Amino acid sequence: RGLPAKAVENYEKQYYQLAINFNDFFVWTNIEEHKKIQKKLDVGFSEIARLVSDYCEKSSNSKAKNTLEQYRKKYNSYVDTPVVDVSEMNFCSTDEIIFPNKRHIFVPQSFKALTYKNDIHLENRDTWKMCDERDDIGKFVSDILRHSITGSLPLLILGNPGAGKSLLCNMLAAQILYHEYHVIIIKLRDTVAEQTVPQQINQQIERDFSNGCLWSDIAESGLNKPILIIFDGYDELLQASGRSYSDYLQRIAEFQKQQKDIYGIFVKCIVTSRITLIDKALISNNSPVIMLSDFDEKRISQWCKIW
């Protein structure tokens, strides 16, 4: 029963005796043992590198997915707050006053749409007179973003002051497009205009959550839904900077292309702006453009009824 163990013991004794008696054999055994140890170390370090890489990847993925989940909660929280901030009212008591939340009182705007061509002047009212009035803004935006051609260019949403562009952005993020996309809203008023688009996204994430998550973490995280980035307030970026960032829409289109080339992902983009000064912007041919209409009597009545 103990024969194999005894054989190994005798082999080791003879092996060590040879190493003592013959220096060449001793050198050879050291070289061979060193090779074996080095091989084990290489395998060990490779495994450590793999484990560290897997950990970093999982950590990055977790950070990205947590950030997107935080954004989902953020936009839902915003549209579920009352349309009037009671804390800013000067009444002695507001106990009996109940205001509807933004989600409940939201009335989708009617709009007009066109495909941009170089000879079109978007600020000219006559341009929009030739376009039909539509009422299906949620479906229209969803269809445009999925379109193979227009979906590779940013969708431009225009409107007069008070047309509801920012609320529409939050409704798109929290409700209308939630099941189709992970949504991030970039407030251009607060960004550094000279930065690249990824840097502006990083800046927005840092301002919102300060969690160290970067755009590259999100782009590399293998999400189950595509990403939609809404750049809200192109006109405010222009006004705040004092410079003409007329190529900004083209920068966003290039950003979309780069994400496909670098990360193999399709990123959809929406840009909102007041119609003022929009003719100074460089807009690519075939870009989809929406003009939000001011509230008509029908929508005002519907809004008041909800209130």
Located regions from the model:
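Long, charged/polar-rich coiled-coil alpha-helical scaffolds that serve as structural arms
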Residues: K63-K73
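Charged, amphipathic alpha-helical linker segments immediately N-terminal to NTP-binding catalytic cores
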Residues: K74-M130
